[in-house]
């Protein structure tokens, strides 16, 4: 494969501040893309998540990786801000947008893992849906016309899990499942216009928040397996990023449009590895160590 297969391409990574979004943005940069990184957490104004990561840091990492990173603060729940973001991309890049990645989430502090629906705070749950689903709809509504006009492009909806298996919390499950349906519906409507849309999930992702929770860093992450043995089978955000970069560089990606994909189902086809040279396969680990306790992972949607 070419070393910079996305040179000259323009991408928008919505929710690129941290975690999978950051990993995707950086790996698109490695592949040579110009990457607009958007989100609420900026050096000039933080979000209510209270984390240190910023869109400017991600853009700098894109630059360091060999791409061009451009940070634009935008709340993707605000249609006016998203419209302005897309208008800027259109003006800057002569109407070009080749890759749209929607990794907006922000639902961690709103997810209730302890209670069934009828005991949950309704306002909190609906806020989660607005952050995790409505933001994706708003972003696509304004970004898709750029792709349709050029009759090419790829939409990537980032989710958690790619099967019908229940994800452990009502609103969390509803949000992550809805993102898969967003990809499916967009694929159906975009196919006549030459634009592909798909969903993708990582396995056990070593996000900044997970590393903090386990008291480790990316450098000594294996020590986290002392607290959670399954963490030994985790994957870095770069692994997800390399999967998305491979999809974006695939001239036959339309064949995957409408599907819910996973990192573990793509590394064999595209040959990418994680940063340590391994190829984590969460589905295989589930089958080996988790199926007896939790049941089958299920077939991809």
Predicted regions: what they are:
Residues 1-95, 105-116, 297, 301:
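Short-chain dehydrogenase/reductase
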Residues 9, 67-68, 95-97, 146-161, ...:
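Active-site loop of short-chain dehydrogenase/reductase
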Residues 14, 97-109, 132, 157-159, ...:
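Rossmann-fold scaffold of SDR-type NAD(P)-dependent oxidoreductases
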Residues 50-51, 115, 192, 204-230, ...:
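A glycine/serine/threonine-rich, flexible loop-to-helix segment
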Residues 92-94, 107-112, 142-151, 250:
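A short helix-coil junction within the Rossmann-fold of NAD(P)-dependent oxidoreductases
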Residues 105, 127-149, 163, 187-188:
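Amphipathic alpha-helical dimer-interface segment in Rossmann-like NAD(P)H-dependent oxidoreductases
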Residues 106-110, 118-124, 128, 154-192, ...:
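Catalytic loop of short-chain dehydrogenase/reductase
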Residues 199, 219-301:
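C-terminal helical subdomain
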